[in-house]
């Protein structure tokens, strides 16, 4: 009704941006006529215009003015370097991103190319643009591939990957445009705020950020805080004992499992049984606490399942990301939970960790003055994106209309029947020759369907978090659209390679060149990391994915399965390929490049960009020849697959979020291709079991049907949608709560990090310490002297003793020196005395080495900030866990948390001040003996 009256708000937004697109198109003809050098010179002209800006607002105005011409320049560079021209809808996407909004673009509409437009425009300011993807592979691919446009136009392009040392990170963050992942960005921010000298800081002030798969990072990952932790010793035998006890406790009798809240509650019988087994009287005994260990052991037993939430690899428990299905090497669950799972699996129990620094993605990305993002599916979460991040969602139209068919869901009574039906559908469509993609929600489920297909003799590829499959991810996806291909994938969200019907000839040709080239020119991995990296990793907290986890070097191989290629290359082409590789070795040297450098060369060779490197030109020639040979078959196969109906996507369980279901569906029917999707469900699926409630169970009894008979009913589909909406609302509330509580921490974090940065930059630390000292003296006076009482009742003697404890250089002061001063006069007197004492202290310290006092000031302030902030984080965590109980006393827990958290923060700031003053006055440096 409202739409009819006011028109669709999305259409209104697009209408507002349309004039920009028209202007870009007007520029196109003139810009086509420019030579390469003239095109590159446009960057210089744009920068000169931006140099005139005197404020951020003026900069934005100039960016809007030059936008049409700048976009036309990028479009032309794209044609020349990559052979790709931005469609009008891609220009629209670029404008939406530049305006700090979220562009919703369907799969296959070229999101990666869209990002080049706003990143070039905003990169012109020189303040840095961060393009964020969900994993290292995609960041590297985009930096190598799309980065060619920016490099051609004269902008610098950086790439930050796990495993890089601080110098490399700093250099890459200093570039105009930096490609990286959300976790690298977040951990670098936290590490920068733990560094002890400006030279260690790797990031610049934040400016503009474009997030690819924005919903995955800002919504799915929002509940996960980024944590850098140090190790604490805890007795491992307690974890093992707790695990044995949990194994003897029974659900419903000794404890209840709340799957919705992912929590366990022990019953009175449970407490009695555990105490009896432990031969103790109180699980909460302060001197020998057991409750925490037992709770974690039960959680590990009931809520964390092997091959679903984690896998065991090389004797280690490795987390599986529930949203992407990828393994998260180096990440650990906190609060002793990871140790409880290690005890359950009987692998080596690693040390427990203590939080040193933490931030949630929600608050991290809000640090950017301008934020934008791209995704295929954001409309379902529009309210949250607008409320939390102040980001509007604008849907861009597709370049070609979609011709995908979404068939209705079929529901079976139990899982076994569902899996059989999935296998049967695969068999039928496979016989027709249609490519099929089966999406599963866990490693375990993907292996169930894999076994069923094996027993039917259907050849298929498996893509899940198991390491042997991860390595081949891009190869598997590149051929998932070939005739008769069957691919099983765990949580397909965010898999960066498109499924092209008939197979991806460009990618296959690149794989073939890589097979021959890489073993000859890439340096073996042992030489890859210099001592600098290792030293840094051990000196600072180890971020995820650093180094090899079990010390054994895996020999890298570039061989791929011969089945991947549509045909074997001709002898003539193979000879040409061998010659090109030999030429590369002659020019670069045998095994002389890092893998990143080699991938970079190959990326340029696989495109059309201008280059003077004779090796790249030779490789490009052979790459194009291989591609042409493959294309003969892939284009014929493309036609065949289109006639058969395109890719068929099978979903095997509704995800907690409709958005992830839509992402899976979006794999079929890209760029106007035909395709179809269907979901196979069972009443035993998690979503229905946990959130469907009694309604679904009632429906199940109504349908007195055979096990293998599918149920199709509008009522049931309605219940499913309802369950999903319930889950989405439930998780939205959790994220909102995380956000509200973390907002309290965020304000404190900003204050403490700003203070830390001021100290790091060393802006007049002496004056800062003197202010600390004066405030400390004021607090001592206020503690012992009450101005409302007569002077004879003032405790002047103890006040003096306390002042001397802090500043021993005041030891000559006596009660008589204070005479009959007023409170204000006493404070002024102490201010003067403490300044004199500090000058005296400085003279003593600087005798040992000139300038030592300045170093000591920085060292002690940073040391106190870090130590007390670390303790404060633990206290705030404890407060947060206990504050929920206030709700029972008719008090709002959030308001109580804000109030108490603020008081604790003020106390911490006072402690920092006092400890710094005390430490500096107690500091007694030793004179270094002179070398003879």
UniProtKB/Swiss-Prot annotation:
Keywords: ATP-binding, Cell inner membrane, Cell membrane, Cytoplasm, Membrane, Nucleotide-binding, Protein transport, Thylakoid, Translocase, Translocation, Transport
Class in the EC hierarchy, top level: translocase
Disulfides per UniProt: none
Major location (coarse): membrane
Cell location: Cell inner membrane; Cellular thylakoid membrane; Cytoplasm
Membrane topology: Peripheral membrane protein
Enzyme Commission number: 7.4.2.8
Catalysed reaction equations from the record: ATP + H2O + cellular proteinSide 1 = ADP + phosphate + cellular proteinSide 2
Gene Ontology biological-process annotations: intracellular protein transmembrane transport; protein import; protein targeting; protein transport by the Sec complex
SMART domains the record matches: SecA_DEAD, SecA_PP_bind
GO cellular component, one term: plasma membrane-derived thylakoid membrane
A Gene Ontology molecular function term of the record: protein-exporting ATPase activity
Matching InterPro entries: Helicase_ATP-bd, P-loop_NTPase, SecA, SecA_CS, SecA_DEAD, SecA_motor_DEAD, SecA_preprotein_X-link_dom, SecA_SF2_C
UniProt xrefs under CDD domains: DEXDc_SecA, SF2_C_secA
Annotated positions binding ATP: 90, 108-112, 498
Family: Belongs to the SecA family.
Function: Part of the Sec protein translocase complex. Interacts with the SecYEG preprotein conducting channel. Has a central role in coupling the hydrolysis of ATP to the transfer of proteins into and across the cell membrane, serving as an ATP-driven molecular motor driving the stepwise translocation of polypeptide chains across the membrane. Probably participates in protein translocation into and across both the cytoplasmic and thylakoid membranes in cyanobacterial cells.
Quaternary structure annotation from Swiss-Prot or TrEMBL: Monomer and homodimer. Part of the essential Sec protein translocation apparatus which comprises SecA, SecYEG and auxiliary proteins SecDF. Other proteins may also be involved.
PANTHER family for this protein: CHLOROPLAST PROTEIN-TRANSPORTING ATPASE, SECA INNER MEMBRANE COMPONENT OF SEC PROTEIN SECRETION SYSTEM
Protein name according to UniProt: Protein translocase subunit SecA
